[in-house]
Every structure is written in structure tokens, then in C-alpha cells.
Amino acid sequence: MKQLSFILCLAGIVLSACTVGKQEDLKGIAEELCQYVPDHQLLERSRDYMTDDFYALLDTMFNLPEHEAMDHEWLYYFVTGNGGTIADFSVDTVEMKDATHAIALLTVRQMWEDSTYTDDEDAEEHRLYMEKVDGKWLMSDFDEHKQDCIRHIAIWRKEEAQRQAISDYLAKEIGRDYLQGEVCIPVLMLVATEDDSDDEARIWGDFWVFNYNLVGDTLKTVSGGNHSGCMYLAKDGDKLRVTRFEQTEDGAGNEESAKRIFGSHYDVYQGMHSNEDVREAVRQEQLRQYIQANDLQATCYQDYGWDAVKL
């Protein structure tokens, strides 16, 4: 009986040692995976350390076009802010969920380039999700950002369809009333969006139409103008289209009509509309996207009487 008890005790010790050893192995793997947590960028070599679906989602997110600067800003701050620090990871524990899934609990502190740390209060807790695929442990999620990415991509695609419908309307219905150029490239600065249903929406914005001729590598402005107001969009088959456009008036009635059309969004609109620097920054960003999407050999644009602006 004593011998049996001794054997059982020994087996328990061996099992415990194996469990501890496995935990230590997983901690080491988690520490290695921490090197590939996205921080302001997604490293190409991260592909080998992430599950296919997680890498594909992040790759899609990091390559989504930005209509305005920092549209996807939250992506850049997975573990650090914008203060020039470096994320220093510490794996506290690893919890096995089943034979092929585990969660590593991390503490992340911010370290300066001289290897000193910021205030201890800046230390944050994070979760690194691990999945064993073909015998190799990979990162499958980080702080549930996988679902964040799925939601964000769905929203982006919906907004992209809305933007395309508005751009088409401005180019075809509004742009045709101006002196024509080789290309019409609208500028959209969206103030607010209200979805009336899954198939209908109202979008308030500061909209601009610009017609250009491509001379050498320069898009030279031929004509253009502002058309602020509210666009009414509805599904037409598989696509969205503008069914109505309520514009602000020109001249003396401009302010009154803008207040009526924009309502509670007026202050945001006015702040946007009156800031030429913001408008030009958005214009440049959207011009770059158009040039890339349409394979134009343009590197700058030029309004009449002004110097060319490099893109």
C-alpha cells in the first residue's frame, strides 16, 4: 500500500513538472510572438507567426485607403501611443483553453530609446491569443482586435459605396455644368451620416467638383466649385445612387440655407468649410487615391495662377 502511494505521489510530481514545463515553453513562445504584435505597422514577416485569417484581416486593415488623415488611427496604437516609446512586453501567465488554444496575459510598459521606462502607471495589461496549427503555435488574435477589424472593414466598405455614389453624382450631374476637362475628380468632406434604413441614408458634406487636364505630370485645374449640402442615397439594385441633393444657396442666402440644411451639424460643417488648410489636405489625399486607382501619370496638381503642388 505504501509502495502504491509512493508511485502515485511520484506520478503526481512528474505530471506537475510536465505541466510547469509546458507552461514555461508556452511562455517562451508567447514572448517570441510578442515581437510581431502590430505597432504602427504590420511587418511582412509577421505572416509566419500569425494564423492565416488573423494576418489577412490585419493586412486588409493596414492597406485600406484613407480618405482623410488617420482614418484608421486606432490600428497604430495596439500597444503604444504616439510619444516615441517602444513597447516592452512581459508574459505573466499562459492559460491553456484546450489542446490547441491558449491565452497569454501580458504586461506592456513603455520604454524610451535610452532603455529607461515611463511612469509605472503607464503599464497596461493585454491578451495575446494563441492557436496551434500544424504543430506550431501562432498568434490568432490580440485583445479581441479580430472582431474590431471585421466590424471596421464592413463599415469601411459601406462608407466606400456611399462615397462612390456621391462621387459619381458630382462628376456626372454637377461636373457637367462646368467647363469640361479630361477628368473630373470630386473632393468629399463628410460632415455627418444618418442611415434611415439598410438601403437608405442621408449624408451631409462639404462637396467640391474639380475638372482637370493632364499636362505632362501635372493635373491643371480647368474649372471647379463648391456644392455643400445633404445627399439622399438609396439602393438601386446592387448599387447605391443619389436620389436627391439639397444644396446650400449661393450669395446672400448661403448662411441661412446652410443652417437649415445642416441643422445640428452646422457648426461642424462651418468649421470644416472655412478651413482652407484642411480642405487642401483632404483634396491632396483624395487626388493621390484617384491617381493610384486610375493609374494616372501625375505627380502634382496646379490651380490657375498658383504654383504646382507636389502630391
Identify the meaning behind each predicted range.
Residues 91-93, 125-132, 186-194, 228-233:
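Hydrophobic/aromatic beta-strand elements that line small-molecule binding cavities or substrate pockets
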Residues 38, 99-134, 138-160, 243-311:
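Low-complexity, intrinsically disordered terminal/linker segments enriched in charged
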Residues 60-118, 187-218:
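Surface-exposed, charged secondary-structure patches
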Residues 1-4:
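Positively charged n-region of N-terminal signal peptides that target proteins for export
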Residues 41-69:
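Short, well-ordered alpha-helical segments enriched in acidic and aromatic residues
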